[in-house]
Amino acid sequence: MKQKTSTAMRLRALVLSVLLTMPLWVLAQISGVVVDAEDGGPVPYATVQYKGNRISAVADGNGRFRIERHNGWRLTISSVGYREQVVNVNPKTPAQFTVRLSSENRTLSEVTVKSKKKSRYSRKDNPAVELMRKVIANKKKSDLKSHDYYRYQSYQKIGLSLNDLKPETLEKGIFKRYPWLREQVETSQYTDKLTLPLTVDEMVTEQLWRKDPKAERTIVKGTKSSGVNDLFQTGEILTTVMRETFADVDIYDDYILLMRHKFSSPIGRDAIQFYRYYITDTVYVGADRCIQLDFLPNNQQDYGFRGQIYIIADTSYQVKRCELYIPRSSDVNWVESMQCMQEFSKQENGEWLLTIDDMIVELMLTDFIQKGVVTRTTRKTDFSFDPLPDSRFKKKNPLQIEPGSDSRSEAFWQEHRQVEFTKSEAGMSGFLTHLEQLKGFKYVIFGLKALIENYLETGTREKPSKFDVGPINTFISQNFYDGLRFRVGGQTTANLNPHLFAKGYMAYGTRHHEKYYNAELTYAIAPKQYLPQEFPVNNIIFSSKRDVALPSDKYGINDKDNVFASFKVHEIDKMFLYNTQRLAYEFETSTHWRFSGDLKTERIDPIGSLELKPVALDAAPLSKMRYTESTFGIRYAPDEKFINTKQRRRTTNKDAWYVQLQHTIGYHGLLGGEYAYNYTELEWFRRTWLPMSWGKIDTRLRLGKQWNQVPWPLLPMPQANLSYIVHPQLFNMINNIEFLNDRFASLMLTWEMGGKIFNRIPLLRKLKLREILEFKALWGSLSERNNPYLQQNQSSTLLMNFPTNSYIMDGKKPYFEYAIGVQNILSLIQIEYVRRLNYLDLPTATKHGIRFTITPTF
């Protein structure tokens, strides 16, 4: 009896287990039926597959199929004679649905008929153009910012892989020696090519919006990175640059910033003039009947897309699906192909909003370097338009990073990951371990770090570097006083102390056997991850320096000892030996306000033909002069974003405008200071993108005034570029200390046209050259109180005679120069012809010049 009871209980438990797990099994499956879009009849034996993931199924004779559910993957349904259809599987994809396939023959026939027409494209009485006008007119219906509030969650995965590996390659060389490397290779679900994933990065954010008062917030809830970028301390630069370069696309914007270029949107305000449109078919996208509209730019080398837009076939004129491609003849560098696929989903309130945004960019630097592919997938979910409490907007920083966002648990990622990892992506950690065990691999990484980061690390991934040696490109340089110059330096990192940082160098000049040094100690009030300049700064800095430099070196962005910038276009025989001690405080807010203040005492000794000669006839030249000053500055750059290199912090979004104001006060008698003065300077920068792919114009304005009587070393000097390297923010044809003013205004305009003209010249079109024009102007004047040549100033105890070949500008005659250049020579080189327009009668004036730089960019 007991045995029968026990058997019955086991049977009931088994049945209960099956019943409980059956819903989970059903939810993990997708089933459907494939039908002909025209007559609704079943399409038998259609192929249903996740391309690149080796999971597939075949529909039965009635068109019915069943396949595993993999959220974030692309399900492709195809059959002979029909156009394949792709379904982006996500949590909202129903467990059962109908797939309607359009006949390939009918569509091809229509396209063939159209292609045979030789008639000129016309916008007048063109139904495709009229349809697009209605789509553009109804754009506001999908504008999230028309709501008083919104919130949604965004998941993004971005990866970098080696691309287009050949099957024969996997059977020889390193792949044959290391089977684990061959196992890392997979087939891309987007391109069907063999790829080797190298990095994969994830980010989960919450997007918030309030219309009144206007506020927008991005809250980073989780980030995760794995792959070869973990081998580099600055590896997050790769992730940041990829996110900036291959950013999310919003076709409802007028222009789309992608790969450092602005592309005209196919539904932007200038789209009708920029693109050609053709209605090609009526198809089903999912369950929605859509009008397929193909488009391409008038000139396919302009920065525009070709592709298809699928518009809901009703009076809403909303976009259901969009496929964007960069034409093969496009002017973009190193991109073999780019495709961006977007899908819009109907929300409960009836709006069509972007929920799926995938981008695949195949890269090719040269024929002999392995190709790469960047894959970026974005999913937007959980849209809500309910009012948000003011507390969600209390913090003013538009980008907020939750504590612990970079160390979320696996449970967090299982909950928020909208796109499943492939086998190779999931095994990235083991792949990295295998790589590090390769013989000689650590030496390869050491060399790559030196090349990429310009510093030599003294640690490993297991024991991170506490001290980095560099910059490498300053180890050897030259100048007229030192001759050949040797320098060695380095800096501590947060691995030694996250608050206290030291950096500096020792240098030696071979001609006069002079020794120099620079030592800097920084206390970061907020702990840093690696270096003290990480945003936002809240630092106290003390530095001491003894070194030679040109007066204009303070305006340069690069280190003055950069070996490439140490060769000058003019003969240099005037320098100063600086002996400087400085105490500074720098503070940045999360809203990108920057406040700074310092106290500096500096002694300068003239070198070469430079003299510090007072105007009094009986006065002897001075061997030195000392001044003590404080500089207080404020800077605002609300849209700036950064990456942290080991040398400096760099702005990633060059479109960000800024304005800064600083005032300097000189103290007589403080720390040996011999002069009292006030100097004010204002700088403003803005980038303007021109419509219709006419490029961009950078505008830079600077104003400055010295309010007191001072010797000439304390007067503002023109920002002169004395090297052969292009510097857009410096004057190319002004010599060392050529003009001395006590008030000035400078305007610099740079117009990068992006090949707009060259692309229309048949012989130049294939070279993908790009035009650049520059115009620079300087207005300056010298007040009577600072003019050493006036009789009334001959008894001054402050003024000094100007150096040889230094001049006073005519206040009614601004200085002008321009440059005409060619960018993108061999996809790397920029060469400019620079021309000085006036003040040519001065003995040191040079009328013409050539400048160059290497600027790798898309």
Segments the model singles out, each with a brief description of its role:
Residues 117-290, 296-304, 366-470, 474-477, ...:
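Structured extracytoplasmic
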Residues 35, 47-49, 79-80, 97-144:
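Short, acidic, small-residue-rich periplasmic hinge/interaction motif at the N-terminus
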Residues 29-43:
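Structural motif
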